[in-house]
Amino acid sequence: MVREHDRATVRELSHFIGGKHTPGTSGSYGDVHDPNTGEVQARVPLADRVETEAAITDAAAAQREWGEWNPQRRARVLLRFLQLVEGERDALARLLSSEHGKTVADAHGDIQRGLEVVEFAAGIPHLLKGEFSDNAGTGIDVHSLRVPIGVVAGITPFNFPAMIPLWKAAPALACGNAFILKPSERDPSVPLRLAELFLEAGLPPGVLNVVHGGKETVDTLLEDPRVGALGFVGSTPIAAYVYATAAAHGKRAQCFGGAKNHMIVMPDADLDQAVDALIGAGYGSAGERCMAISVAVPVGEDTADALVARLKERIGSLRIGRSDDPEADFGPLAGRDAVDRVRRYVDLGVEEGAELVVDGRDFVLPGHENGFFAGASLFDRVTPAMRIHREEIFGPVLSVVRAADYEEALRLPSEHVYGNGVAIFTRDGDTARDFTRRVNTGMVGVNVPIPVPVAHHTFGGWKRSGFGDLNQHGPDAIRFYTRTKTVTSRWPSGLREGASFTIPTMG
């Protein structure tokens, strides 16, 4: 477990293997910062190949028993886990906020959306039901089973340190697999605590292992034949690498990358509602969400002029503060590199000729000059060819791309290299229906700015936002974490004929 010293001492974190906190042995460490101050608050060990292989060995041994538990018994562990998390939800939210930088209220949402998938996975006795065909041929029955893969792994990002680990771990465990989690080294304390709570809930030691690390850790998980499937969420270049490497080693993979989510604002939209949606979806969590709205597409010049004027006014009243400030709309970014990246993109937008309506580059929170803060920025008259439209910024920057008509607005997200999510704000049902059917993205919101599906539906983007044919949570999660076995059977009374040398048919 984390060893606590006095406040001036950096905490030493550990791996979690075999139900125990395991110190790192590689000699390599990463720093965990307080985004509010920029100070190092903890050190996290980075596993080498030997440490990662030890975690796989432990998981493989533990899975054999866990996979034999009946689904109801596994579901009870998930239900007890839910109760334990509820008992310390506020402490978890504050811990998450202290390492990531999102507000405590936003951290509560991070945890809640993860727990909803745990609730979904607790229905595993129903979700694992197979198919049955009685008398498919004379005296022959056919049925299918969904069986665990064995050892599976998840590589999760810094921006949702509770939600995405739970999105991956809960269905994987419910299906009878052992799960190895490699969380982000930026904010690893909440994943470690969740692993402790799973153990307290009755999960056998070794069924859930947490290993921190970098590329060597990831490559070990990808190359070891004992790991049968792997999920990833992060940047598109790494998602593509993980997917290709997993496929080359015969593994099932679901990999989710970057996004550039557009929100279409039709002339008939409720403009106040649209502005509220854009402010929250564009600047909430300092824009560090894969489902953040980063491009507003007003249709028509009058709509655009009115929208930009209202956005400018609203941005001026945003409160940026410490992550533990209950009055803050958003807090710091997760790292100094993130602040530098956001500033470079704002500089680039100016160079490309976009109109910088609100400039957040020079924002400093008094008394927190070394914190990882960036102010809200707003660009108008961005064109599709500009890099600030083509590339993911992942920060508090909203771009306005004006569309002359509906068809032009529809083309913008449809032709973009990313295809994660999109939203349309309109009062017209025909327009909304046409948009949802024709737009080329994986998730669509109608008057909903962040269309993250509920737990019993699947989450996933298209094009360069997602690699693999099965998405996260919902029915796809059960398919991803199991293999289908089909059994064809008949009994002695039907076995009296002699040898047959032709392919059997069900006559």
Functional labels for PLM-detected ranges:
Residues 1-36, 361:
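Hydrophobic face of amphipathic alpha-helices that form TPR/SEL1-like repeat modules
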Residues 37-43, 227, 264, 312-319, ...:
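Conserved C-terminal structural/oligomerization subdomain of aldehyde/semialdehyde dehydrogenase
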Residues 38, 74, 96, 118, ...:
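Residue-level signal for inorganic ion chemistry
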Residues 39-128, 139:
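Glycine-rich loop-to-alpha-helix module at the N-terminal edge of alpha/beta enzyme cores
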Residues 41-47, 62-68, 154, 263-266, ...:
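Short, well-ordered beta-strand elements within core beta-sheets of diverse protein domains
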Residues 63, 67, 82-89, 93, ...:
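Structural signal for hydrophobic packing residues in well-ordered secondary-structure cores
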Residues 130-276, 403, 468:
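Rossmann-like NAD(P) dinucleotide-binding subdomain of oxidoreductase/dehydrogenase enzymes
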Residues 237-383, 412, 446, 493-497, ...:
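ALDH superfamily catalytic-core signature
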